[in-house]
Amino acid sequence: SENFVGVCSKNHRFANKTILPDDIFTEHLFLREKGSGTRNILEQVLSEHNRTTGHFARVTCINHFTLMSELIADNLGITFAYEVMQKSYSSLAPFYVKGWNIVRDFNYVYLDSADSLEILEAFDNLSE
């Protein structure tokens, strides 16, 4: 299981803080594509609080997490992701929403090859 957290720039006012739920809606939200696991988790949590992604000031869908993380590092918005993903980018910081304790299973999907397994093991070591 892995924590699902808010992700922002290390220079963002939310960085390493616990914020009130309504504070997130003034932000530019970066989302993964429809059908992605992280987007589904966020939409489910928002629904549980009678909200949608439409409540954010601005929403942009980006299918590439590296590009998204670069925009977030430049303090252009926020996203929500597994904490292990946030930790793999030194320019990003977590933030927490008061009353949201989101923990989900984190599953790896990879090609069955020696190279893939080696990369997976290296990535898995980041979370330890």
Label every PLM stretch briefly.
Residues 53-64:
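Short beta-strand-to-loop elements that line the ligand-binding cleft
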Residues 95-128:
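A late-sequence structural motif
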Residues 10, 82-85, 106:
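Short secondary-structure boundary segments
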